[in-house]
Amino acid sequence: IYDYGFEGLRHSIEELQRVGIQTFGAGRNLEEVYQPCLVEHSGIKIGLISVGEAQFGVVKDDFDSTNGYALALSQKIGKLIQSLKNSCDQVIILSHAGLEMESLPLPEWRSLYKSYIDWGADLVIGSHPHVIQGKETYQGKTIYYSLGNFFFNSSNTSEAWTTSMGIECEVSP
């Protein structure tokens, strides 16, 4: 989302909102960046939080951004999860993070995603590595480390690069 810097981000947000698509996990200021998406379906309240890494699979946020995207390691994430847990039936984390082209998640990411569960998340869905990294059940909750490539415009035709995993979630209060 930040490949074209702040102007690209700003333009993307404005265009999505112009056609009625709600954005979350990125923004033009810190309030927008850490604003979750709240959805109600069949009387069930779902809180969605989107986070991203600094880059290159490193579990480190080495900058303090006033705009951009919600940082996966920000201390705000744990507090946001706990806050949503008090007002939502389900809390789902969408994470764009991890080391690209590795079939197993780094131990640091496994630990962080488990922390999200410890803080109250009900489901963690990872993306970014471009390959499937599998799933794990932790404290009765599911963590998907990377769903692979649903679509990626690339000349790479290896099976790992062109394979993705879809998930269907059933939510209940």
Predicted regions and their residues:
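Acidic, metal/ion-coordinating pockets
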Residues: 1-173
